[in-house]
Structures are given as structure tokens and as C-alpha cells.
């Protein structure tokens, strides 16, 4: 049985459906504190997925918490860990390019809120500087997308 390590800081009420998808696909989940990210395969600790619940959370991480987020990516790089940020959003955001057309809901109340084009540029720069990938999925597909990404990385690195 393949084991997925799930970070203990993942909130139980947010991951019920994800864990059901893991179980249905016959993956065992073990909760443990991870150095970086939220998910990894037990057999491949050098690839992690950092799950974000939506673009609003991702925007907060890379804008308001920019230094902390960069420090986490640098720590991963220093340890040889590849990070993939998986952002749960709607069907309108399927790629990094699509982020350009995102309309930040905070713009209604704050004209200085981050726009989609700006967020795209920040994510692209982080991708270049820290070799981080940004992937997107619908909320109902998160568990399956995590499995797909973990398996693909394992195959690319000769793990499976």
C-alpha cells in the first residue's frame, strides 16, 4: 500500500473529502509534521505539495506573508526538496497564465488590493527563483490531483 504523509497542520474539517479520495484510491494516510508543504509520499520525501484553499489564501501567502513564504521555499531548496503549490480554485483558473484574469474579491473594498496580473508576476518570479511549480484544481478534485502529482513526480525521478 502506498503511504501519503499529511502534515498535522492541515485542518481536519478542510481535508475530509481529500482523505476520502485517498482512501477510495487505496492510499494510506499518515499524519506527521512536515518540514515544508502539506503532502508527500513516504517513499519520496524530496517532493512535497503545499495546498492552498484558493487564490485568496495564495495571494495572502505571497504578498502579506512574502518573507515567510520565500523562507519556506529557500529552506526546501537548501534541503533538495521540490515544492509544488496546489491551489484549489474554480474551473476558471487552470494554469498560471489564468491567474492574470483573476479578480480579487478584496478589490471591491480596497482599490489597492492585489490584482490578478500582479499576482501572476509574483508567482512567476517565485517559480523562476525557487523552482516551485504552481498547479490548480477544483475543490472536489483535490485528493485525486494530489495523487496524480505525487505519482508523476515519483515516476519522473525513477521512484516507481
Language-model-derived ranges and their functions:
Residues 1-44, 57-160:
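Non-catalytic C-terminal interaction segments of nucleic acid-processing enzymes
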Residues 47-53:
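Conserved catalytic cores of phosphodiester-cleaving nucleases, focusing on short active-site segments
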Amino acid at each position: 500500500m502506498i503511504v501519503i504523509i499529511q502534515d498535522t497542520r492541515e485542518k481536519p474539517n478542510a481535508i475530509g473529502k481529500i482523505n476520502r479520495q485517498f482512501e477510495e484510491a487505496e492510499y494510506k494516510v499518515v499524519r506527521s509534521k512536515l518540514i515544508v508543504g502539506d503532502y508527500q509520499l513516504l517513499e519520496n520525501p524530496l517532493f512535497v505539495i503545499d495546498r492552498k484553499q484558493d487564490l485568496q489564501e495564495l495571494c495572502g501567502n505571497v504578498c502579506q506573508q512574502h518573507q515567510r513564504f520565500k523562507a519556506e521555499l529557500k529552506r526546501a531548496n537548501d534541503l533538495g526538496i521540490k515544492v509544488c503549490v496546489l491551489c484549489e480554485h474554480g474551473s476558471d483558473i487552470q494554469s498560471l497564465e489564468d491567474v492574470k484574469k483573476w479578480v480579487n474579491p478584496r478589490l471591491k473594498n480596497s482599490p489597492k488590493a492585489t490584482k490578478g496580473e500582479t499576482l501572476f508576476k509574483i508567482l512567476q518570479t517565485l517559480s523562476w527563483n525557487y523552482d516551485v511549480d504552481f498547479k490548480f484544481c477544483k475543490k472536489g478534485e483535490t485528493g485525486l490531483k494530489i495523487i496524480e502529482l505525487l505519482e508523476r513526480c515519483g515516476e519522473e525521478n525513477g521512484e516507481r
